[in-house]
Amino acid sequence: MKYATGTDNAMTSGISGQTNSSNSASNEMQPTTSTPTAVHKEATSTATTTATYANGNPNPSANPSQSQPSNALFCEQVTTVTNLFEKWNDCERTVVMYALLKRLRYPSLKFLQYSIDSNLTQNLGTSQTNLSSVVIDINANNPVYLQNLLNAYKTFQPCDLLDAMSSSSSDKDSMPCYGSDFQITTSAQCDERKLYARKEDILHEVLNMLPLLKPGNEEAKLIYLTLIPVAVKDTMQQIVPTELVQQIFSYLLIHPAITSEDRRSLNIWLRHLEDHIQAAAAGLTNRSYFLQPSPQLVAGGSSTGSGSCSSSATSSSTASCSSVASSSLCPASGSRSSRTNDWQTIAPPSKQLQNKLAGDWRGSGGGSSSGSINPLCDNLNGITLNELASSQNSLGLSLEGSSSLVNGVVAGAGSMLGIGGGDDHDTSFSKNGTEILDFDPVTANMGEACSLASSSLCGRNGGNPVEDRSQPPPNLQQQLLQPPPYASILMGNVGDQFGEINRWSLDSKIAALKTRRSNSLTTQTISSCSSSSNSSVITVNDNCSNSTENLAQFANKPRSFSLSIEHQRGALMNSGSDTRLDEFKPNYIKFHTRNVGMSGIGLWLKSLRLHKYIELFKNMTYEEMLLITEDFLQSVGVTKGASHKLALCIDKLKERGNILNRVEQELLTGQMELSTAVEELTNIVLTPMKPLESPGPPEENIGLRFLKVIDIVTNTLQQDPYAVQDDETLGVLMWILDRSIHNEAFMNHASQLKDLKFKLSKMKISMVPKMHHVKPAGVGPNNGNINKPRWNGKTRKCDSKSGSNDRINNRKNSNDMLNFSLNCLPHPLPHHSQQAPPPLPQFDYNGYGGGPSHQPQYKSSSYPSFMGNPQQQPPPPPSSKSHHHPQQMQQMLQQHNHFPALPQQTPPQSHRRSLNNLILVAGGPQQPQQLIFKPGQGVLTNNGSNDNLGLERNQQPQQQQQRKLSGGVSSAEQQPKKTMAAVVMENLAKFDQHFTLF
C-alpha cells in the first residue's frame, strides 16, 4: 500500500467531497516545492495503480472503475488519520511518529531518513525562523542556560507581571491557556526572571528544548531530570497543569539519551503523578482548573468531569487536552471494575474475551465513559519491547491492580517502553538470553479492529459507521470523535512486529537492543516509596539520579550491578543470573550508524577487549574518534587503565598510513618477508576505515593503501617462484581477505576480494602436505633412533620377581610357548649349556647381536630403514671371510646338525607388532637360503633323528663338505656362528636344552 501524496489529484481521485479541513490536511502531505505537472500526473497515476494492486487487485491493467472503491477506502483512511493527526499537539504527534516508524522495515526507514534530512535542509535554509531554531537548539544543550532556567523555576514566586509573557516559548499560542484560573499576585518583583511570568511558561520552554537534547550531553540531561521532582510536586499542588508534565515524561521515556537507570528514577515520580491523577479523578482532592467537569459529559450521565480548558474551546490543542483529561477520569465511573489493571499491567490478548469490545460498548449510564475508552485501550495487550524493557520490569515499578489508567501522553510513551507492573502479570521468560513471550502474539483481527482511530469511525467496507449491536450509544459518538489515548492508537497489533523492530532502528538511536540475560525466575523490584513522605522520596530520587555519573553518555547500555550506594540491596538480591553474557552479540557489536567508517568500531573494540565502551562511539564521527584523548576518556568515566589503552590504540590508528607505506616499499624491494607483511595486515584489518570512495587526500585513504599491500602479497605468492608458500601464511591471508569482504571500507570491492580468496584457496589445496620429519643418525636423545621407544627391545618389561631377564608378553597374541620351562628337553651337546657365546657382528639379526647396531627388536623387515640404511648397517666382517657366505652357512648347519633341514618357504605377510611371536633364523638379507621356523611346523630332535625327517637331495653333499672343513676351523671361530644358540641365550636366561619353534 502506498500513500498517494503526490498532488491534489492523488488525494481527490477517490473522494468526491471533503471539508476544508480535510483538503488542508491533504495539502500538508504534499511536497511544497513544485506544482502539478505532466510528470507529477504520471507519477500520481503510477502510485494510484500500485496502491490499487496492493489493496487486493492482482491485475494492474484492470478497469479503473473497478479499483475506485479501493482507492476511495484507502484515501478515506488516510484522511481519517490526517484528521486525527491534526487534533494532536506537537508532543502527541512526535510520540505517534516514533511508534509508527518502529513498525517500518529498513528500506522504508532509509527512505524516510533521506526525506527528513532533505526537509530539514530546506526548512533551515528557507524558513524565516531559522535563527530562532538555531538558538533553541543551542540553548537545549547549554548546561549554563538550563541551570539558570532550573534556578528560576525553583526560586520563582508568582507575580502579576503579565506583560512579560510575550517573550515565552514560540509554541505558547498552540498550548492551552489557563491565565484566568491562576492569578496569585504578590508585591515581589521578578527582576531577572521577568521573562518567565509563571512556572508554566518555563515548562513550555523545557518542552520545546527537550526533544533537541543530544545523546551524550550528560550535564544537560541531569538538569532536565532534576526538574522532574519539582514539576511533579507543583502538579500535586495544582500550580502547573498535569498535561505539561505528562508531555515532558513522554519525551524523557522515549529519548535515546535516557538510560535504564534514569528511567528507574523517573518511574518513582511517574507513580506519584499517577496517584495524583487517580485521587483527583475520584474527588479526593480539590479539583483544579484542569479537572473541572465537562458540560458534555455531565449531560451524558457521567459522574465526573472531563477537564477541558473551556467549554467553547475549538483549537486542536484544547480538543486534545479534553480527550486526555476525559480518558484519565474513566476509572472513576461506575464500570471502574471492568479494568483491574493499569497501563503497566495489561493482560495478554489470549486471556481476553473475544466479545470484550461489544460488551464494553453496550454499557450505559455512568459506565459509558469508561466503556468508550476500553475498546481502544485494550489493544495495548501483549506489547513487550525487548529493546527498551526487560521481562522482569527493568524499570522496577511495582503497582497494584487497582491503580488507575494513566492515559494521554504518558500512557502512550509508557506502554511503548513496556513499563512493568505487578509480579503477577504475564511476562516473558528467557531461554539462552532470548526473550520468549508467554502468550500468543496479537491476532490480525484484533489488530485491524483498533489499529487506527478510523476503526471507531468507519468500517473497512465503506467507511460507514457500524450499525449493529456493537454501535456505541449516541451520547458517546462525540467522545469517540475526539482522539483517544496515544497508546490505543499506536500500539494495536504490534506484538508480531518486534522481530523487525529489534533488527532495524531509526538513526541508530535505539540500535543498542536489550541483550542482557533476563532473570526468568526472579522479578527485580525496588522498594516502594509511595507510602513515605515527600522528603524521603526526594532522597531516593537523588540517589538514583547520581547513579548515572559513570559513563553517562552510554545512552542505552545497561550498567552492571555493583555494591555502590545508589543501588539498593533488594535489586542486588533479585538480580538473578544478570551476568551480561549475551550483551555483545555480533548484531550488537556491528551496529548500524550513519557515520561513515564507524560501523566496524565494535569489532575493533572487541579485539582490544574494550567492547564495554562501545556506547561511547555510537554518535561519533570518524574524525571525532581520532581526536579522542586520554583526558577526555577519563572525564567521561572510563577507568584509568582502559582510557590509557584506548588512547594508545587510537594513536596507533593515526600511524597506519606510515606503516602501510613502509610495508609496501619493503615488499617491493624484497627487504620484508611475506609472513611479516601478513602480520602487519592482521593488525590493521579490524580497525575502522573509511570507504575507498570517501573524499579526502590520498595519504589519508587507509583502505586504498591496505588493498595495495594485499595485492602485492598475493601477486608475490602466485607469481614469484622463490616466495615461501607457507600453509600458515596462506591461512592467515585468507582470514584477512574474509574480514575485508565484510568491512565497510571494501563493500564495493567485495567481488574482487572473493575471487582473490578463491585463488588462494586453490593454491592452498594444491600445496604438498608436510612429510614426517626424519631425524638424522646420531642426533637426539635416542642417538638417531627415529623409531618409537615402546618398540625398543631394551625398554620392554622384564620379570623382576623371578630375577630373570625374560620379557613379559602382555599382548593377547603373544606366544605362551616362550615362557614354559625347557628342563625336560634332552640335548646331545651338554658343553653348550654352560656357555653364552657373544653374538657375531656380521650376523646381526634384527638387533639380537651386539655392536653399533641400533635396530629395535621385533621390527618388520618390510621397513626400508631397518636393513637398507647404510648408517645403521653393521660393519663388514674381515676381508678373508667376506666372500665365504656359502661356507659359513655350511658351518652353521654343521654346528646345528640336530635341527632338521626343511624346504625353503616364503615368509608370510604379518604386522610388525606380531613379529614377537616369530624367531627368524637367517643368514641376512643376502643369504641364498633362509630357514624360517613357524609354530607347529617343527619338532625337537637330536643327531639321530635326521634320518626320519626326509632330508632334501642336496643335504648330504652339504654335510660332507662341512665335515671336511670342520677340522680347519677353530672353536673360537665356530662358536659365534651358533646363531640359533645366541638368539635363544639372549631371550631366555640359562638353557639346559635347545629348542626351536616352527
Curated annotation (Swiss-Prot):
It comes from the Eukaryota. SUPFAM superfamilies: ARM repeat, SAM/Pointed domain. GO terms for biological process: negative regulation of translation; nuclear-transcribed mRNA poly(A) tail shortening; regulation of DNA-templated transcription. The modification Phosphoserine is found at S564, S575, S971. It is found in: Cytoplasm. One of its GO terms (molecular function) is mRNA binding. Its main location: cytoplasm. Residues 1-45, 50-69, 329-370, 773-892, 943-977 are annotated as: Disordered. The keyword Disulfide bond does not apply. Residues 1-37, 801-822, 854-864 have a biased composition (Polar residues). InterPro entries: ARM-type_fold (IPR016024), PHAT_dom (IPR015327), PHAT_dom_sf (IPR037093), SAM (IPR001660), SAM/pointed_sf (IPR013761), SMAUG/VTS1_RNA-bind (IPR050897), Smaug_SAM (IPR037634). Residues 600-654 form the SAM domain. Coiled coil: none annotated. Residues 583-763 are annotated as: Interaction with cup. Pfam families: PHAT, SAM_1. The keyword Cytoplasm applies. GO terms for cellular component: cytoplasm; P-body. Keywords: Cytoplasm, Developmental protein, Phosphoprotein, Repressor, RNA-binding, Translation regulation. Translation regulator that binds to the 3'-UTR of specific mRNAs such as nanos (nos) and prevent their translation. Prevents translation of unlocalized nos in the bulk cytoplasm via the recruitment of cup. Interacts with oskar (osk). Binds to the 3'-UTR of nos. Interacts with cup, which in turn recruits eIF4-E, leading to an indirect interaction between smg and eIF4-E that prevents mRNA translation. Belongs to the SMAUG family. The SAM domain mediates the association with the 3'-UTR of specific mRNAs. This is Protein Smaug. It comes from Drosophila sechellia (Fruit fly). The lineage of its organism: Eukaryota, Metazoa, Ecdysozoa, Arthropoda, Hexapoda.
